Structure formats: C-alpha cells, structure tokens
Swiss-Prot record:
This is 4-hydroxy-tetrahydrodipicolinate reductase. NAD(+) binds at G8, A9, R10, G11, R12, V13, G76, T77, T78, A103, P104, N105, F106. It comes from Corynebacterium jeikeium (strain K411). Its main location: cytoplasm. It comes from the Bacteria. Keywords: Amino-acid biosynthesis, Cytoplasm, Diaminopimelate biosynthesis, Lysine biosynthesis, NAD, NADP, Oxidoreductase. It is found in: Cytoplasm. Pathway: Amino-acid biosynthesis; L-lysine biosynthesis via DAP pathway; (S)-tetrahydrodipicolinate from L-aspartate: step 4/4.
Length: 257
C-alpha cells in the first residue's frame, strides 16, 4: 500500500485526488495539506509519494522539501520554465533515488492528443494550437499547449520541413498568437470552460483537427494515479506522462528529462 500526501488538498484537483486515494484500497492518504499547513506532516506520517497541485509560487519550496526528505513527487502545478527544471535536477543529484514527475496534463486524452499531434505534424505544411481554459487560470498559454507545440516543432524539424507559410505583415499585437518554436499557440480564457485543446493542421486541399476536452477535474485522476504508482521506479526528473503510458517512442525521442 502506497502512503500518499496531497498538497493543495482543498483545491479542485487536490480534493478529487484526496477522494480517489481514500476510495482505493491500494493507497493510503497520510497527509492532506493546504496553504498554511506544515509540510513536516509528510515526514511525520511517512509519506512515500506526494501529489502537488498547488500554485507556481509554492511548488518549488514544496519540491525542495520533498526531495530533501526522499519523498517522490507527482506534480501538476503549472508555471514551469527550463530554469526551474534545472533547479529540480540539481536537487535530485543530491537524492538520486528520488523521482519527480512533472506533467503539463494528466488527462490521458490530452496526453494522447499530444502524441497524435507529433505523429501528424510531418504530413502538414501548417500547424496551430488553440487552448481554452477557465478564467481563473494564471498562465497563458497553458503548459499543455506549449508541450504540444514543442512536440510538433520537433517532429517538423526531424522531417526537414520548412517554416510554416504565413504572409502576415500587419496585425494587432497578439493576433497571431504566441510563437512556440515556430508553432502559433492561441489562448482563450472563458467562463464555463475547464480544460480544452484543439490542434489544427493544414496542407493543400485538406485539414486535420485534433480536439480534446476535459469537462471535469476528475478527468486528471486516472493519470495522476498512474504517476503515483510508477514514480518510485523512475528516479530523477521526468517531464510528461508519456513515458509512464509507454508512449515515449521514436516520434518524440523519449520523455525522460
């Protein structure tokens, strides 16, 4: 039985994880921590794995504490940069048996969409990403959209494709979206949305649209629990859930950081 601590336990995703752990005979909830609570409860209650769905300002301190105490971490908190990843890698060098999984999205449908986008990318001249989220999301574009665009860019580069055709010379600021390695990414923030993504491909005479929708935050729970079950066998930093689903094949060159 895996002993689990949840950080951000009173948040929308965190509360769904708490409910899932409590309902599963193979996992034991030993700490449910939220803003203002003491992380020492993780050590005192012998947590083996932490699930972190907090905020960008808190996640680095949480991870430093967990790594220093040999507690594996499954992280869905947003706001990641390469500098932050490098910091985590440095901490993990001092705790080589500890594993940290950071995933831009834990919905299995979203992970598959990212994979399908990489597969499709070499066959189309043009590709753009549109992500749609609730208005309380603090980062734009989403980590999922950035991860999707980066995968598309890698696949296009590997296939030797030229830059995407775009004759735009006059536009309002932001009209063509954010440029992620040559792939335009557009962010929508709208009441009534939860987490959604569209990837649109085009070439002569045809288009392909991949569409993914998460209507409820419970959609993230199955992927989170896969991460919880497998992180102990994967020391170091892993970015993306693909590896744990067996999807880190030749197309994306592997998800191991």
């Amino acid at each position: 039985m895996t002993r689990i601590g949840v950080l951000g336990a009173r948040g929308r995703v965190g509360s769904a994880v708490v409910a899932a752990v409590e309902a599963d005979a193979n996992h034991e909830l030993v700490a449910a921590i939220d803003h203002g609570d003491d992380l020492q409860a993780l050590v005192d209650n012998k947590a083996e794995v932490v699930v972190d769905f907090t905020v960008p300002d808190a996640v680095m301190g949480n991870l430093e504490f967990c790594i220093n105490n040999g507690i594996h971490a499954v992280v869905g908190t947003t706001g990641w940069t390469e500098e932050r990843f490098e910091t985590v890698r440095g901490w993990l060098q001092e705790s080589p048996e500890t594993g940290v999984l950071v995933a831009p999205n834990f919905a299995i449908s979203a992970v598959l969409t990212m994979k399908f986008a990489e597969i499709a990318a070499p066959f189309f001249e043009s590709a753009e990403v549109v992500e749609l989220h609730h208005p309380n999301k603090v980062d734009a574009p989403s980590g999922t959209a950035v991860h999707t665009a980066e995968g598309i860019a890698r696949a296009r580069k590997a296939a030797g494709l030229a830059e995407q055709p775009d004759a735009t010379t006059q536009s309002l600021d932001g009209a063509r979206g954010a440029d992620v390695q040559g792939v335009p990414v557009h962010a929508v923030r709208m009441t009534g949305m939860v987490a959604h993504e569209q990837v649109i491909f085009g070439t002569k005479g045809q288009t392909l649209t991949l569409k993914q929708d998460s209507y409820d935050r419970e959609s993230f729970v199955p992927g989170i629990m896969i991460g919880v079950d497998k992180i102990g066998d994967n020391p170091g930093l892993t970015i993306g859930l693909e590896k744990f689903l067996g999807l880190d094949g030749d197309v994306n060159g592997g998800a191991k950081a």
